[in-house]
């Protein structure tokens, strides 16, 4: 397996992920107006799950705007994992 081919596929995987995720987040934007608190009973209660979702949204938006070449190695590894699956599928194809 060529390292250049793997990196080219990894870059493409990132572009595909970014395109889909950007679209999905735009569609879901009306329901993703997350605060840190949620209504519970007669008051507002801190919800750590909402905080985690908010942090994930920030990370995803940053990753969407970041070209593959500028991602961290850990982030690139996620795209490389999918590129490797494509390479295996291509090698197995008749």
Where would I find each of the regions flagged by the language model?
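Alpha-helical propensity feature that highlights long, continuous alpha-helices across diverse contexts
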Residues: 1-94
């Amino acid at each position: 397996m060529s390292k250049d081919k793997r990196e080219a596929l990894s870059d493409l995987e990132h572009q595909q992920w970014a395109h889909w995720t950007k679209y999905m987040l735009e569609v879901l934007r009306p329901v993703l107006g997350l605060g840190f608190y949620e209504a519970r009973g007669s008051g507002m209660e801190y919800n750590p799950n909402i905080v985690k979702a908010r942090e994930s949204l920030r990370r995803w938006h940053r990753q969407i705007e970041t070209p593959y070449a500028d991602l961290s190695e850990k982030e690139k590894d996620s795209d490389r994992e999918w590129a490797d699956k494509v390479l295996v599928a291509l090698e197995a194809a008749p």
